[in-house]
A protein has these predicted regions:
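Hydrophobic alpha-helical transmembrane segments
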Residues: 1-118, 127-338, 342-447
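Short, acidic/turn-prone active-site loops that include or flank metal/cofactor-
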Residues: 121
């Protein structure tokens, strides 16, 4: 074993061992647990650079602070502050980060010859290790901290859901961006755990028993629609499969009214992508694959809507979930309209951070024409949601406001983080829908 691999293993061993502190969450109040995370952060900032320099990578030894040793305790602190009364969720996500991400690195270096097709820096063996080891650690810690939650969560949640969270985290880790794994892995895992924590066991049982025929019909319709989309070259093969799964989920959970809103969003995105193709091609900013939508695009733009649709039938917050569903789709559709209209017919394009003129298609660029078109698109999709009885008329303003804010946040992050490779377009699209859904639900709560 050479010195470089030895230091890598030493770093990951420390990474894994820090996860042992998660066992304390069974006995600590949230503010006490937060102090532990703050203490770890202070140690990593003040002491680790002096005593642990030998295990640093050569390129890191000239830096005062390393992202990893700072972001790890920051992520743990964030988990504790976000889930002060569900420390089992914080512990499970912490375990997935500690053992899952740690073993992914160790296994990937030793046996990771087969690489992930869309990210050659990641290996299949490493992703499998993250899923298995992270899922096991998350499940054990969720079970261990179960007595600290009042009332205790269902046993199926503690022992089963962490594996689902680890699977999502393993996929998220393969996304080709520079967003640190210490944020991406626990963040995605905690989001999955939180969604499942809101679900009612009785509603799950009722949905499983009653939705069988609806699921079959939805699968047949969406499979056919996906095949037609593939034949018309509006989606790739992977995009067709992802779209069929998402469409089936939405149709089964929200009835055909919700599915019609999804279809309208897809049609709007596909049509707007084909507007002004000649100018976009000349400028070198035409959509890849001739505007065909891939799996990443489908999940980024409509994945959150599918989750909201499931929450509408599996939680006791149906009204809020349906508002989130409509806002996510309105944001996805209006964002595509704004982007494509801006690139096709925008006369002047400005960077949102400093309003300097930039070329159309620049990350974070906005135009008057695109912004206006996006607002109109959000309004039309929101009105369609009202007409389809997906949301009440009182939710129209929150949905449009959420979609508009989501678009501006996406542009801001595009100008700052996408340009540096920390985020990519698919992650920006997902953040856009998340901001829209969250904003709409919060506005409905204050109405």
């Amino acid at each position: 074993m050479d010195g470089r691999q030895h230091s890598e293993d030493a770093r990951k061993l420390i990474h894994i061992l820090f996860g042992g502190c998660a066992f304390l969450l069974r006995y600590l109040a949230w503010h006490e647990a937060a102090l532990v995370a703050i203490g770890a952060l202070a140690f990593n900032l003040a002491i680790m650079p002096r005593v642990g320099a030998a295990i640093y990578r050569p390129a890191d030894r000239t830096r005062r602070y390393l992202h990893g040793i700072v972001l790890y305790p920051v992520a743990v602190l964030g988990l504790i502050l976000l889930f002060p009364y569900r420390l089992d969720i914080a512990a499970a996500a912490w375990g997935i980060l500690a053992l899952g991400d740690g073993m992914a690195s160790i296994v990937g270096r030793r046996w990771g010859r087969r690489r992930i097709p869309w990210n050659r820096d990641k290996s299949i063996a490493g992703s499998v290790a993250l899923f298995l080891c992270g899922g096991a650690a998350g499940a054990f810690l969720a079970w261990w901290c179960r007595p600290a939650v009042i009332p205790p969560p269902f046993l199926w949640f503690s022992l089963g859901v962490p594996f689902v969270a680890a699977l999502v985290a393993a996929f998220a880790e393969t996304i080709p961006v520079r967003l640190d794994d210490n944020i991406l892995v626990p963040g995605s895992a905690a989001a999955v755990l939180w969604v499942f924590s809101l679900m009612s066991e009785d509603l799950i049982r009722s949905f499983v028993m009653d939705a069988g025929m609806q699921v079959l019909i939805a699968a047949a319709v969406n499979g056919t629609a996906a095949w037609i989309g593939f034949r018309l070259r509006t989606v790739t093969t992977a995009g067709a499969v992802a779209g069929a799964v998402i469409g089936t989920t939405i149709a089964a959970a929200t009835s055909w009214n919700g599915w019609m809103l999804l279809l309208m969003t897809f049609l709007v995105a596909s049509i707007s992508s084909r507007l002004g193709v000649h100018r976009k091609t000349l400028l070198g900013i035409a959509e890849e694959r001739g505007g065909q939508r891939g799996a990443g695009n489908a999940v980024a733009n409509t994945g959150l809507a599918a989750v909201a649709a499931l929450m509408a039938v599996l939680t006791n917050s149906r009204d809020a979930a349906m508002v989130a569903f409509a806002a996510a789709l309105a944001a996805a559709g209006s964002d595509t309209i704004a982007s494509e209209i801006g690139k096709a017919w925008g006369r002047r394009t400005y960077l949102i951070t400093n309003l300097q003129a930039v070329r159309p298609g620049t990350s974070g660029a906005i135009s008057l024409e695109g912004t206006a078109a996006g607002f109109v698109g959000a309004l039309l999709l929101g009105a369609a949601a009202v007409a389809l009885s997906v949301i009440p008329s009182s939710a129209l303003f929150p949905v449009v406001a959420g979609a508009t804010l989501g678009a501006f946040v996406e542009s801001l992050l595009g100008a700052t983080l996408e340009a540096r490779g920390i985020l990519n377009n698919d992650l920006l699209n997902f953040i856009n829908t998340a901001v829209a859904a969250t904003t709409a639900v919060l506005l409905m709560g204050t109405a």
